[in-house]
């Protein structure tokens, strides 16, 4: 939102004009329906210049149908882009094949580079000679003539022209190490394991911590992430019947690293690259102890 707001300001347009489409989640539901997204694009598309979504929604963990959204946007003449921060390294991405116009992402989530790690960007090759950067840097200059120092910019085509300067070596090293591990397998294999791993977590949560009318005082958990594996990545977003901060603190005290998001969600993401099914089982056992302590 901040980036879009800044871009709109630089173009001399107000936020109200730029972010004019508001989404409403249906009563009793926690996520957006794909058909509703496509219907809005079809209805409003003639007034929309750019459609921009998250690949995976950070709060709910919902994986959007990027291919369908891209096709719908293109039918109305819109540019379509995605923030893939929670998608890269998590789900299979075929940005080029889907015809996505542009995308960006960070590397400190599923790519394991650490907080503040390098970002990444994608521009479809069909735009390589038409989309130009607003901010120029010498690293975007053609390598063959970069050091001639003639003060005439010879911009590299595509996303390479958006580079500004040297990569910081201390940030490159952890990312390179992580990508070398990724190269030992494939996203297809990781995704297959991920579906099973998160499915196992979902099964155990529903088995042990679903609301039980016969035990009205027992804490329970509601999963707000879609149950369909095709509409989620690793992450399950959990909503609790008791104050979430206490649960988070009890888990943290027991050595479990989760993520709390206000107002009421705990994000849990068993990651196939380094988590196991036994990790998931231990988490469920620890979660039970944390719930017991939190509600006592």
Residue ranges and their predicted role:
Residues 1-296:
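Pyridoxal 5′-phosphate
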